Amino acid sequence: MTRAFNFSAGPATLPESVLRQAQEEMVEWNGVGASIVEISHRSADFMAVAAAAEADLRTLLSIPDDYAVLFTSGGATTIQALLPLNFAAPGQAVDYVVSGHWGKTAIKQATPYVDVRVAADGQPGGYVDIPPVASWTLSPHAAYVHITANETIHGVEFRDTPDVGTLPLFADFSSSIASEPLDIRRYGLIYAGAQKNLGPVGISVVIVRRELLERAGQPRADIFNYASHVARDSMLNTPPTWNWYLLGLTVKWMLEQGGVAAFAQRNAEKAALVYGAIDGSGGFYRNQVMPTVRSRMNIPFFLGDEQLDALFVSESKAAGLLALKGHKAVGGIRASLYNAMPVAGAQALVAFMHDFQQRHG
C-alpha cells in the first residue's frame, strides 16, 4: 500500500511510524492481554502512558515547572468558551486580537460571559497582515489578551510573541504548536487542539501558569473548572484514552526526530519551497499575505478562477496529493505543512504546481 501526501488542515497527516505502531498495538497492548482502548484510565498501565505523554511534552516544549499541563476532551472551540469562565470575572474586560477566521470564533465563544473588546482587527485589510502591536488598543485591567498564533484559513502567523506588558497573554496554538521554538514564559496560557501537530482529533492540550488557576473566575460546574482538572491530573472524568495514547506516541516521535529545533528547520524548508513556487509563477498562483506574517503551516493560494481551482484539486488528488481544496470561507487552494508532512511532500507539490502551470498556464 502506498500512502499519499495528505495536505489536510485537520484532522491532519500523522507520522506513518506512529500509525504502524498503533496498528500493531491496537488488539493487544504492552503484554496486558487487552487493547489500550479497553483498559481503565485509572489503571497503573494507562497512568504510565499519561505520565509519559506529559513528561515528553514538557521536554519537547521546554515547559517550566510553574506551568500546569492539561489534556482535555474536545477541541479548541471548547477551550475558547472555558477561558472566560475560568480566568475572568462576570462582565470583566478581555482583549482579543483578530487576525483571521479563528480569532472571530474565539470572540464568539467568549461573548456570553465577559466584556469582549477587540484590541485590533486585520479584517479591514482582508486579513493579509497583522496590525502592529503599537496600534493595539489594550484595556489596562483586562483579564487577558487573546491571540490566534496561526490562522489556518487565511494563512497568517505571528512570527514574534507580542509584548502586552503585564497583562496575561493567552494564545491559540492549535495549528503551530511544536513547529518552532517557543518561550512559554511569555504567555499566561497556550492551548492547542491536537489534530494538526500533536495527534488525532478529540483531545486538546492546555498549558497554563499555575498562579492563574487561583483566579475565582465565574460560577461553573467542576467539569468546566481547570483547577479541578489539574488537581485530578486531567482525569476528573474519563478521558479519551486512545487519543491520549496516540498523542504520546506522536510527541515521542517528534523528540526522536530531533525536537522542535529540527522541525523548525524542516518547516522553514517546506514553506520556502511552496512560497517559492507561488512567487515564481508570474502570477499564475497568487498569495496575498504579507511576507512578514506568512504562515509556515498553512499556505493558501489562488489560481485564475474557480474552475481552474477545481481542476487543480482534482488533478492533484489523482497525482497522490490529497486535501488541497481551500476552506469554504475563502476558496482557492490550501497546502497544510504540519510537522508530520515530510519535505518530500512539499517537493511533490511543487513539482505538480510546475507541471500544472505548464499545461494550463
Swiss-Prot record:
One of its GO terms (biological process) is pyridoxine biosynthetic process. Keywords: Amino-acid biosynthesis, Aminotransferase, Cytoplasm, Pyridoxal phosphate, Pyridoxine biosynthesis, Serine biosynthesis, Transferase. It is found in: Cytoplasm. L-glutamate binds at R42. GO terms for molecular function: O-phospho-L-serine:2-oxoglutarate aminotransferase activity; pyridoxal phosphate binding. Pathway: Amino-acid biosynthesis; L-serine biosynthesis; L-serine from 3-phospho-D-glycerate: step 2/3; Cofactor biosynthesis; pyridoxine 5'-phosphate biosynthesis; pyridoxine 5'-phosphate from D-erythrose 4-phosphate: step 3/5. The keyword Ribosomal protein does not apply. Disulfide bonds: none annotated. It holds the Pfam family Aminotran_5. GO terms for cellular component: cytoplasm. Pyridoxal 5'-phosphate binds at A76, T77, W102, T152, D172, Q195, N237, T238. Binds 1 pyridoxal phosphate per subunit. HAMAP family: SerC_aminotrans_5. Belongs to the class-V pyridoxal-phosphate-dependent aminotransferase family. SerC subfamily. Catalyzes the reversible conversion of 3-phosphohydroxypyruvate to phosphoserine and of 3-hydroxy-2-oxo-4-phosphonooxybutanoate to phosphohydroxythreonine. This is Phosphoserine aminotransferase. The lineage of its organism: Bacteria, Pseudomonadati, Pseudomonadota, Gammaproteobacteria, Lysobacterales.
